[in-house]
Amino acid sequence: MTADHHNTIQSQGLYVWQADNLLAATAALSGHWQPAQESQDSTELEVTSNRITTDTRTIQAGDIFLALSGDNFDGHDYINVAASKGAIAAIVSRPISTSIAQLVVDDTRLALGQLAAYRRQQHPNLTVIAITGSSGKTTCKEMLGSIFGRLAPTLITRGNLNNDLGVPMMLLELSDHHRYAVLELGANHIGEIAYTTEIVRPDVACILNIGTAHLGEFGSREGI
């Protein structure tokens, strides 16, 4: 979500992803290209895209599809669906038989974070405000987003994209016109805030409160 003065729009991301910077972003995860079926020459691989997405329902022509996997789903099962909708490449943890090039990495969930961190590093003039706490995050985010959005184009966390998947997804929406980012960081498990903070690298951190409503594996207020 982008607050652009009085207008709120979804950013499409203006940074260009290409074969070489995708490799650079995922180097720590052994990223390497598997060319499309009709071409076995990875040296001539051409990939140029403005957007990475994890949802085949929102695929647009020219997108790159990142195949996430969970307990009850496997994005690798939908790579050919993504290709049929115009995706030009896929980011996978195991190559499959498909008509598009695949960037093979050790872990696509971690690759999402690496790609988001790379995008953040591309934007050294961006001021990032990160907000966390047991309650009040969304209200504070909306207030600050409205304020900063009147000063300059501002990326604001959309919906509940505040976990270790949602935060990097939001950063992938950064484009070169953004000057501020107001990001909400949630914590469902130990280490999640440390992980998302490393990706976001905030200039300003807002810790609103520490309550006991959602202890989960933290066990106590002290654990949080």
Predicted regions and their residues:
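Phosphate-binding loop of NTP-binding sites
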Residues: 111-223
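Short, basic phosphate-binding NTP loop
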Residues: 2-132, 139-150, 172
